[in-house]
Amino acid sequence: CDLLSPGGLGVISFIDRHATLVHATRQLILWKACYLSGVEDVQSEDCLNLAHTLYDDDFASIAASRPFDAWWKDALISPWTNNHLWTYQEIIPIIEEAGCEFYGSSPKWAKVDSFDWYKNLHTSSERHHSLLESWGSAFPYFMTGMPPSGQKNPLPSLEVLRSVVDFVGDISNYTSPEVSAAEVPEYPAALHQYFNQCEDTSINKFNSDMKMLYDAARGDSLDNLLATYRSCKVFRGTWGAHYHYVCFVKSD
């Protein structure tokens, strides 16, 4: 922000700690499949073949700009840690403290200025408070990548948010740095209950798929894990909304 002149725009990108769950789940499923298959090296051809078995059809359904093998290297087997992830709750206060104000984002999810008369001028603090409230309403979208259906979904409690952060951290530990016999973390009860309370039936089905996937991943049958993944049609069509650009403007 110090590099900007008043009225100047800055842009940052980040991976959202909550919204990375779908991506992290695909990585965990591959890690567990490798363990059950006796594949010790995730950089190996055997791991790549397992990834093709699991994810070929899913990957073919999206408008990808890179081949499957490149996605496997970048998204599935590259090491990552929870420490490198961020949230809007962390970033927005930093932007405000630096004398800047939220301007826009991609994906465009914030409703901070929607249906507001242009003469209603708000302070940066007021807009940022409204922005973070809007984030809670968009939480199911962040987690699944599925656009809002117009049906009512509850706001996530602090318990739900903490359960997601802890869960993502546990997955990060499980998939770093190598395949091991460590126990797969259990799908959080608080998150399971939250998704079940959503009125959107697609969110409910996504939730059921997630619960089945983690139950299967905590077992010791490769065939059951592969069959369960194939049956999870809603999850397989989701990719989360984990990668974000934020634009901010330097205050006068």
Report each predicted region and the residues it spans:
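A short glycine-rich, Lys/Arg-flanked "PGG" loop and its adjoining helix->strand segment in the class I
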Residues: 1-9
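Short, low-complexity, polar/charged sequence segments that are solvent-exposed and flexible
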Residues: 4, 29-33, 123-124
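Conserved class I S-adenosyl-L-methionine
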Residues: 9-57
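Rossmann-like AdoMet/SAM-dependent catalytic core
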Residues: 63-249
